Design a protein with these regions (language model features):
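Short amphipathic alpha-helix that is part of the acyltransferase structural core
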Residues: 2-55, 59-75
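Short, well-ordered beta-strand micro-motif
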Residues: 66-68, 80, 180-182
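Conserved beta-strand in the GNAT
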Residues: 74-83
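Cytochrome P450 core scaffold surrounding the K-helix E-X-X-R motif
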Residues: 86-92
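Acyl-donor binding region in acyl/amide transferases
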Residues: 93-167
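Short glycine-aromatic motifs
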Residues: 168-174
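C-terminal "cap" of GNAT-fold acetyltransferases
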Residues: 174-191
Length: 191
């Protein structure tokens, strides 16, 4: 289930940003983290990651965890994900991964090997922004991280539909916590 591993390099980060930029999605600036979290909380609920945790993870991962899109200068959509270390992948399988307060050891930092992708959240206030972040996520999962196992724990009915119907995730065998996953893409593994 590990697929092919990827190094969290400058080239990888540039590819990720370039893939998302094609959909008008860009890394959140440090001053935008609170607004991005507030937007997500309004749409998903307050039981999500805190602003401080989002900011910490964004910093630890070299600004490749929280992305935003705007319309007419207003923040309208967010896409958040984590790139996991080998220890993070094991924590997911063991049920010990805490998405609201991920251990630094569970995150793949710049220069380290990425073992898995964890979809942290998607939220948008308009159909245009929703399309941007979902299409951007789809492009990243088929491209930059296609060779990795991908995980998520949807918390809303809309999130469950998105992950299963539009993104092709299935229940993770043996998980009783609502965790879904997508196997590494064969074409990406072969490439």
């Amino acid at each position: 289930m590990d697929g092919n591993l990827i190094r969290h390099s400058v080239a990888f980060s540039a590819r990720l940003r370039r893939d998302l930029a094609a959909f008008h999605v860009r890394p959140a600036e440090p001053g935008e983290v609170a607004a991005a979290r507030d937007l997500a909380a309004q749409l998903i609920g307050e039981g999500i990651v805190t602003t401080d945790e989002l900011d910490r993870v964004q910093h630890l991962t070299g600004r490749v965890s929280l992305f935003v899109t705007e319309e007419e200068g207003a923040l309208c959509g967010i896409l958040a994900f984590m790139l996991l270390s080998g220890e993070g992948l094991r924590a997911v399988y063991d049920g010990a991964f805490d998405a609201c307060a991920p251990s630094a050891r569970h995150l793949a930092r710049p220069g380290e090997i990425i073992h898995a992708f964890y979809g942290w959240g998607v939220a948008a206030t308009t159909k245009t922004s929703a399309r941007r972040v979902v299409d951007g996520a789809r492009a990243v999962m088929a491209g930059a991280v296609g060779s990795l196992p991908k995980f998520a724990r949807p918390t809303t009915e809309a999130g469950h539909r998105l992950m299963r119907e539009r993104l092709g995730f299935v229940d993770l065998p043996g998980s009783d916590s609502g965790l879904v996953w997508q196997a590494p893409l064969e074409a990406a593994v072969a490439a």
